[in-house]
UniProtKB/Swiss-Prot annotation:
Belongs to the argininosuccinate synthase family. Type 1 subfamily. The keyword Ligase applies. The gene is argG. Pathway: Amino-acid biosynthesis; L-arginine biosynthesis; L-arginine from L-ornithine and carbamoyl phosphate: step 2/3. One of its GO terms (cellular component) is cytoplasm. This is Argininosuccinate synthase. The keyword Lyase does not apply. ATP binds at residues 10-18, 118. Homotetramer. It catalyses: L-citrulline + L-aspartate + ATP = 2-(N(omega)-L-arginino)succinate + AMP + diphosphate + H(+). PROSITE patterns: ARGININOSUCCIN_SYN_1, ARGININOSUCCIN_SYN_2. It comes from Clostridium botulinum (strain Eklund 17B / Type B). Its main location: cytoplasm.
């Protein structure tokens, strides 16, 4: 392999990126600068610098991207109502473009020759990282070890690490592939690869209680939204990061947001994962219910179509594209009236709407009541039905004529 002077490595401290440091030095005879994008993984950052240096990196950047992640990536996606294949709240998908953008910025500042990532050649993340890099530096060399090295499995990785004294905290029995940020925690691999196996929730879950261990009494919370963004919890104003942290704690306690899913990957195969998204699931439910109160029918129905496309774009690594940006502008316009307060009941994995109000509510009890009212003339419906049903009547009469042989 050609010698490189300096390589920027997207570094998490996990198994993949830990062994990539010595592999890069052995194969490219280069300086390795590790970059960790802090998107809210918290305790996973402990001891990371010491580990990176000990493994062979010349330095480690720990970039605090959490605020930008929540405000510029998570909240706009909530506003879009984007859910991939009806289940996945895109926890890994929208983190990768942000990290990729920052990798390019550091690579330029350091005068690096290449950017390296530890994504498997079977996964979606290789696409997400590399499209982000190409969006900001189309000429940057990208190294993807999983596509070129002789290591073929997680077991091979562990053996490689042990042979080079790379410090790792996992073992062969609990070697789930995980991804964690302030939004979610994903679990893949091992027994989860067989869809007939029930997940061992008591062993897997880290952010959440299992249903069985959730409290036997419900928890009530109140969320306040302004223009589609949650701004307060139980009447207390909070910044976006703090609010999401608090919802993660409350939701996790009540077993909210645990998803076992078989999804269609961008690269063609199906994969299975268990996702923990406690706070995010609460926000999606609250936001969607408030939209039901505040959006008119045509906007709401059209936005459902946009939500599906937006989810595909994010999942497929197309965050930095004209279409995603254009859709975000449309969505932003729809959120101008999504302001109000919603009370939620959380109980053993369930979220129940317990009442909501909005100054922009389009719900009129005066019109909708089953009781007596003075504003709606029910006789008006007759003319409406006559005109609305006219195509049906014309078609029915045409078939009647054909049957009679008179047409």
């Amino acid at each position: 392999m050609n010698k490189l002077n300096k390589v920027i490595l997207a570094y998490s401290g996990g198994l993949d990126t830990s062994i990539i440091i010595p592999w890069l030095k052995e194969n490219y005879n280069c300086e390795v600068i590790a970059v960790c994008g802090n998107v809210g993984q918290k305790d996973e950052l402990d001891g990371l610098e010491e580990k990176a240096i000990k493994t062979g990196a010349s330095k480690l950047y720990i970039e605090d991207l959490t605020k930008e992640f929540v405000e510029d990536y998570i909240f706009p996606t909530i506003q879009a109502g984007a859910i991939y294949e009806g289940k996945y709240l895109l926890g890994t998908s929208f983190a990768r473009p942000l990290i990729g953008k920052r990798l390019v910025e550091i690579a330029k500042a350091e005068g690096a020759d290449a950017i390296c990532h530890g994504c498997t050649g079977k996964g979606n993340d290789q696409v997400r990282f590399e499209l982000a890099v190409k969006a900001f530096d189309p000429d940057m060399k990208i190294i993807a070890p999983w596509r070129i090295w002789d290591i073929k499995s997680r077991e091979d990785e562990i053996a490689y690490a042990e042979a080079r004294n790379v410090p790792i905290k996992i073992n062969h029995e609990t070697n789930y592939s995980k991804d964690k940020n302030i939004w979610h925690l994903s679990h893949e691999g091992l027994d989860l690869e067989d869809p007939k196996n029930e997940p061992k929730y008591d062993e897997i879950l880290e952010l959440s209680n299992s249903l069985e261990k959730a409290p036997n009494e419900p928890t009530y919370i109140t969320l306040t939204f302004e223009k589609g963004n949650a701004v307060a919890l139980n009447g207390e104003k909070m910044d976006a990061v703090t609010l999401l942290d608090e919802l993660n704690k409350i939701g996790g306690k009540n077993a909210i947001g645990i998803t076992d899913m078989v999804e269609n990957r961008l690269v063609g195969m199906k994969s299975r994962g268990v996702y923990e998204t406690p706070g995010g699931t609460i926000l999606y439910k609250a936001h969607k219910d408030l939209e039901e109160l505040c959006l008119d029918k045509e906007t709401s129905h059209y936005k459902e179509q946009i939500s599906l496309k937006f989810a595909d774009l994010v999942y497929n690594g197309l965050w930095f594209t004209p279409l995603r940006e254009a859709l975000s502008e449309f969505i932003k316009k729809t959120q101008e009236t999504v302001t109000g307060e919603i009370k939620l009941k959380l109980y053993k994995g369930n979220i129940v709407n317990a009442g909501m109000t909005s100054p922009y509510s389009l719900y009129s009890e005066e019109y909708a009541t089953f009781g007596e009212d003075a504003v709606y003339n029910q006789n008006d419906s007759a003319g409406f039905i006559t005109l609305y049903g006219l195509p049906t009547v014309v078609k029915a009469k045409m078939y009647q004529s054909l049957k009679k042989g008179t047409k």
